[in-house]
């Protein structure tokens, strides 16, 4: 499946279609995005939430879902401990 920015934004904002999109994504084993979607996503996030929405994840108070040790020394709560 190729995932468009519009679907990602809908899921991130918990828009009415979000659950349908999340179910579709979970049911597929291949997730692709256009390279153009990455800067487009950043633009949409900054437009909707201002600069802190795209550059200061700590502002939201939400935990960070990540893989690896790249964020071990930051003061943002992890979704998955250890």
From Swiss-Prot:
The keyword Membrane does not apply. Pfam families: PIN. Keywords: Hydrolase, Magnesium, Metal-binding, Nuclease, Toxin-antitoxin system. InterPro entries: PIN-like_dom_sf (IPR029060), PIN_dom (IPR002716). Mg(2+) binds at residue 4. Its cofactor is Mg(2+). GO terms for molecular function: metal ion binding; nuclease activity. Its EC number is 3.1.-.-. Belongs to the PINc/VapC protein family. Toxic component of a possible type II toxin-antitoxin (TA) system. A putative RNase. Its cognate antitoxin is VapB34. This is Putative ribonuclease VapC34.
């Amino acid at each position: 499946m190729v995932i468009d920015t519009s679907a990602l934004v809908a899921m991130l904002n918990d828009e009415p279609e979000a659950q349908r999109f999340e179910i579709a994504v979970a049911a597929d084993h291949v997730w692709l995005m256009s390279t153009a979607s990455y800067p487009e996503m950043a633009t949409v996030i900054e437009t909707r939430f201002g600069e802190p929405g795209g550059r200061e994840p700590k502002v939201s108070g939400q935990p960070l879902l990540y893989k690896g040790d790249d964020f071990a020394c930051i003061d943002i709560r992890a979704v998955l401990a250890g």
